[in-house]
Amino acid sequence: MIRAVLFDLDGTLLNRNLSLRKFIEDQHIRLNLKHIPIDQYISRFIKLDQHGYVWKDKVYAKLIEELKIKDLTASQLLKDYLSFFPRHCTPFDNLEKMLVTIKQQNIKLGMISNGFSQFQMDNIKALKIDHYFDTILISEYEGIKKPDREIFMRGLSKLGVSPKESIFVGDHPVNDIEAAKKAGMKTIWKKNTHFSHAPAADYCVTDLFEIIDIIEREKGKEV
């Protein structure tokens, strides 16, 4: 019986690629970086960012060096990122519709995200989905991060469910899918352009609303 569905945030619920591109374009305009071609600023930022796995203080330090940015420090640019990125947070299609449908089935919702607590919470609130979740675990606050099995078990404990009663949805084949599978959970891989496949996934989806059909299929196995 499926009693809980837990999610990753970036690349799963939050369309980070689109959100980041919107933010970078806005930052380029707001901070009057017109001496740098906007396409160059965007492409170098995205390359240095490495899908979010490089923190922005390092990204900005490198941008300042490479693009000869003057009158702005890395810390000033980072502060701008922390303040303005949430304003550009864009969900994947059918996010809220999917969450509402799951909640209507009396299934608990959880989120497990790697990152800095305040920044991630700002992004979750920007998507206006925080009220749907029964528990949200962010690695900085928890002191552990995915793929550590403990953060998954902690999330399940907070929801009062066992691994066999839960599904984890994520975009990273190792940190999300393989790790959740090792914790004993069913897994759904949110397909993306960063990774070609996720061998440990029980299911794969391109649209979030496909998760509803998977929940129904899992219910059918219980009969």
Regions found by a protein language model. Give the residues of each.
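Asp-based, Mg2+/Mn2+-dependent phosphohydrolase catalytic module
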Residues: 1-5, 18, 100-103, 112-223
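N-terminal helical cap/lid subdomain that shapes the substrate entry/recognition surface
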Residues: 2-93
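Short catalytic-loop micro-motif centered on adjacent basic/acidic residues
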Residues: 14, 110-111
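Residue-level marker of alpha-helix boundaries and capping positions
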Residues: 51, 89, 111, 167-168
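Short, acidic loop-to-helix structural element flanking the phosphoryl-transfer center
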Residues: 83-110, 149
